[in-house]
Every structure is written in structure tokens, then in C-alpha cells.
């Protein structure tokens, strides 16, 4: 992969800590994620041609084991799609500051056409998404 993509307006990121239970050589890994909720969306400027992988996780309530969520994606102001994810609670990852549990990550791939493009990510306006907090991070990939 070639790099992490940051938002257009350089918003603060949430730290998520992952403890590698089965791999003692890696120890604890801290990654930075952008927050999506009912009031908060994220916009990214991406230059193509490129391939981008969008990782996502949902914040879990303590009594949940499984959760579903939807992410709505727009490319240059045009609806690209609503993506559905089903996930389970992570036993290794949590939000660093609050110690709240998050899900295992899920992902989708976007093929970015030639030129400069703007991508908006938000939670889909569905009853099932009410009250959800989702975290995303984008990685750009290039062919070798």
C-alpha cells in the first residue's frame, strides 16, 4: 500500500488500540480513524487513477455481540452506493481514550478514475443506523 488518505478539512482522528493476542512479536498497534455519526460525515480528495481500500468499524455497546451498519458513499456529489456491513465485536481492539469496544474491521474497495475526485462518506439515513458511531480509515494501493 502507498499511504493513508487524510480528510479535506483535516479533522481530528480517533485512536484505536489493537492488542495482538496470538502474535507476541507485534505487541500493541495504535491506528488513527475518522468518526462517522448522524451529525458527522467525512470528505476526502483522491487523485486517480488509484485503488483505495476503506476500512470501517462500529462502536459497540457492552452487551452486543453482532452489529449491522450502512455507509453511504458519494463521488463528486453523485451517489455511488450504500454499503452494508455485518460484523462482530473485536476481542483485541478498543478506543484508546474511552476504552470502549469496537467491532472487527470490515472493508470495501473503490477504483478511482483518472483525475482529482472528492469522496463523501456518511452513515446512511436508515432507522437501523440511528445512534451508530462508525470509524473509517482509507488506504491507497498501487499496482507494482
Segments predicted by a language model, with ranges:
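Extracellular Ig-like/FN3 beta-sandwich strand-entry sites
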Residues: 49, 66, 114-118
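Short coil-to-beta strand junction motifs in C2/discoidin
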Residues: 63-72
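Glycan-recognition and processing domains
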Residues: 1-49, 57-62, 84, 89-100, ...
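Residue-level marker for the onset of beta-strands and adjacent loop->beta junctions
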Residues: 40-42, 69, 106-108
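Beta-strand-rich ligand-recognition modules
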Residues: 1-3, 75-140
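N-terminal hydrophobic or amphipathic segments with adjacent small-residue motifs
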Residues: 31-34, 71, 109
Amino acid at each position: 500500500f502507498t499511504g493513508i488518505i487524510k480528510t479535506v478539512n483535516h479533522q481530528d482522528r480517533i485512536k484505536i488500540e489493537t492488542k495482538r493476542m496470538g502474535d507476541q512479536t507485534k505487541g500493541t498497534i495504535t491506528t488513527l480513524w475518522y468518526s462517522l455519526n448522524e451529525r458527522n460525515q467525512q470528505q476526502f480528495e483522491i487523485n486517480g487513477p488509484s485503488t483505495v481500500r476503506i476500512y470501517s468499524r462500529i462502536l459497540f455497546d457492552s452487551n452486543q455481540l453482532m452489529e449491522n451498519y450502512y455507509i453511504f458513499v458519494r463521488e463528486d456529489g453523485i451517489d455511488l452506493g450504500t454499503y452494508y456491513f455485518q460484523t462482530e465485536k473485536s476481542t483485541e481492539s478498543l478506543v484508546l481514550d474511552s476504552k470502549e469496544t469496537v467491532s472487527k474491521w470490515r472493508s470495501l474497495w473503490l477504483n478511482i478514475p483518472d483525475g482529482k475526485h472528492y469522496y463523501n462518506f456518511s452513515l446512511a439515513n436508515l432507522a437501523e443506523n440511528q445512534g451508530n458511531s462508525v470509524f473509517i480509515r482509507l488506504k491507497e494501493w498501487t499496482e507494482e
